[in-house]
Amino acid sequence: MNLYNNQCPVPLEQQPVNEYNSLKNSWFFCWPTLSSHSYNKKITITLIATCFLVSPVLLSIFPIAKLPLKFFFSEFIISSLITCFILIRLYLGWSYVVKRLMSATVFYEESGWYDGQIWVKPSEILVKDRFIGLYEVFPLLNKIKNTLSCLSLMTTAPAILFFYF
C-alpha cells in the first residue's frame, strides 16, 4: 500500500519515494545499484572510453614518438578527471534524493509557477522514507565516494610523475 496516495498533496513525480525509484530505474543513475563487479566494469569502460576520446587531442600536443610517457600520463589523468566528473554527477543526484528522503518536510510545486509549498510528512511516511534513505541510498553514496577516493589515489602517481618525465 502506498502511503503517499492517501495523505500527500505532493505531485507524483516530486514525491521522494518516486524520485528514488526513478533514479534507481534510470540508465545512468542505476550504476551504483548494480553488483560491485558490474559497477566496476561500467566505471572501467567509462575510463577506457574517455581514454580513446582524449587520445587524438593529446597526440597533437604530445607526440607519442617523442614524449610517450607524457602522453600516457596525461591521457590517464584527463580520463580520470572526466570519470571523476561523471561520478560526481552520480553522487549529486543520489545525495539530492537522500536529502529529500531524510527530511521531515517536502518542498514541492503544484503548478510550475514557482509557488512552492512545503508539506510536513506524517510519522509513518517519515519512518519509511528514512528507512529507504539509511539502508538503500547511503550505501550507494558510500560506494560512489569510495570509487572517487580510489580513482583520485590512482591519479596521484601519474600526476606527480608527469612533471618528472
From Swiss-Prot:
InterPro entries: CGLD27-like. One of its GO terms (cellular component) is chloroplast. The keyword Zinc does not apply. It is found in: Plastid, Chloroplast. Its main location: plastid. It comes from the Eukaryota. Keywords: Chloroplast, Plastid. Belongs to the ycf36 family. This is Uncharacterized protein ycf36. It comes from Porphyra purpurea (Red seaweed). The gene is ycf36.
